[in-house]
Amino acid sequence: MALSTVLALVSALVPFLHLPMGGNFTLASMLPVVVISYMFGVGWGLFAAFTYSVIQIVMDLCMGLSGSVLLPLFLPQSDDYMGAFAAVSILVLDYFVAYSALGLGGVLRDRVKSKTAALVGGALIAVGVRYLVHVLSGYIFYGAWAEWFFSQEGWFQGFGAWLLARLDGGALALVYSFFYNGLYMIPEVVVTALVAVPISRIARIRREEPLKKGN
């Protein structure tokens, strides 16, 4: 179980896309935690996922303080930082809650006959819930960035102008959060599900009964 958590952390250190306001796309870095939940049960999965979230936040904070990555805790067009409550709430939602959701990966093991479908479906649920938590956090705390984001030049400039002409306020903030977080989470969901297919065929993972700690 510890090895799977380490594998997840190592995979997360090699992002293929790192967005400026947080979030990155990796090659199925969350799958080892999902597999823990599938093999040992949701209880141990949630424990491993929470441990993963704690280590992840420490690593990101260290990189942020060293200047390696941007800590997106400031307000648009301003040098002012968010208040302490907002900053702590972001850490709780985007790390503790979002990453802990990966522990739901084993929720379908005893409900779906096909082992492959159970693992793939569990991965989709776990990573999908993480995506929705990030969307909620983005909507609440980063909605102020929506207008700035969609007004930037780039490949989606036309789409951004179209949105800005039709939406504002909370609706624009919600679309922004779905869009921004979807840039890295949707590919992550797809890749995780695809990699889960061959992983589900490994004999030790396909065991009829969940493994007990120490097996």
Region spans (language model):
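Loop-helix junctions at membrane interfaces
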Residues: 1-215
